[in-house]
Amino acid sequence: MKFAVLVFPGSNCDIDMYHAIKDELGEEVEYVWHTATDLSGFDGVLVPGGFSYGDYLRCGAMANQSNIMAEVKKVADAGKPVLGVCNGFQILTEAGLLPGALLRNTNLKFMCRTVQLKVENNNTLFTNQYEQGQIIHIPIAHGEGNYYCDEETLQSLKDNNQIVFTYSGDNPNGSLEDIAGIINERGNVLGMMPHPERAVDALVGGADGLAVFKSIVKQWRENHVNN
């Protein structure tokens, strides 16, 4: 499987994404600069965290105007997996690929620590290697991770089982319904504030995030290699 890791000015988690795919899973991966205009040669797209364009105007707003985002939408429309983490999640909401928005943390502070997450839906291409209801430990690092949407959208997320991860026990940012990660209705676009790519090696803080990437690869192989 071949992944694209997008790189915007101000991205700083692209290297961790690359490491998770290349070194931990042994899959093919390339960095793709935000000015690129073709993602057709990739099987999946990873939109990393960081501070794209310095978070000026609004987190993810300027990145959404980059050339590459039109291609990301094509990838999503084709049913290929798209994962946005932290700033990547913010970019995906700005692009309209996921509903809602990420607001300032309610304590107005940048939060950087490991949190507990609950796997609310393990029947997705991003979570099939987890158990339903499993509690995992994943780092966060954000100042604007407070997920918000209107009541109609929230009900739709619940009805369609699109809430994939929630904060368990302690909500670090005030996110609505403790939401930490959601997928689109089709199930091939996931946005999450915690950083699974920072939890892929038990020697350096835990490996609970590795299953996100293993899940993507497993689903892809079932759909392509075994057919």
From Swiss-Prot:
| Any Gene Ontology biological process | 'de novo' IMP biosynthetic process
Q: EC no.?
A: 6.3.5.3, 3.5.1.2
SUPFAM superfamilies with a match to the protein in the record: Class I glutamine amidotransferase-like
**GO MF annotations in UniProt:** ATP binding; glutaminase activity; phosphoribosylformylglycinamidine synthase activity
Q: Where in the cell is it found?
A: Cytoplasm
Query: What keyword terms does UniProt attach to this protein?
Result: ATP-binding, Cytoplasm, Glutamine amidotransferase, Hydrolase, Ligase, Nucleotide-binding, Purine biosynthesis
What PROSITE patterns does this protein map onto? GATASE_TYPE_1
Transmembrane regions: none
SMART domains xrefs: GATase_5 (SM01211)
Q: Name one GO cellular component term.
A: cytoplasm
**What biological function has been recorded for the protein in this entry?**
Part of the phosphoribosylformylglycinamidine synthase complex involved in the purines biosynthetic pathway. Catalyzes the ATP-dependent conversion of formylglycinamide ribonucleotide (FGAR) and glutamine to yield formylglycinamidine ribonucleotide (FGAM) and glutamate. The FGAM synthase complex is composed of three subunits. PurQ produces an ammonia molecule by converting glutamine to glutamate. PurL transfers the ammonia molecule to FGAR to form FGAM in an ATP-dependent manner.
The record, for PANTHER family, names: PHOSPHORIBOSYLFORMYLGLYCINAMIDINE SYNTHASE SUBUNIT PURQ
What is the protein name stated in its UniProt record?
A: Phosphoribosylformylglycinamidine synthase subunit PurQ
According to its UniProt entry, this protein's organism is: Lysinibacillus sphaericus (strain C3-41)
User: What gene name is listed for this protein?
Assistant: purQ
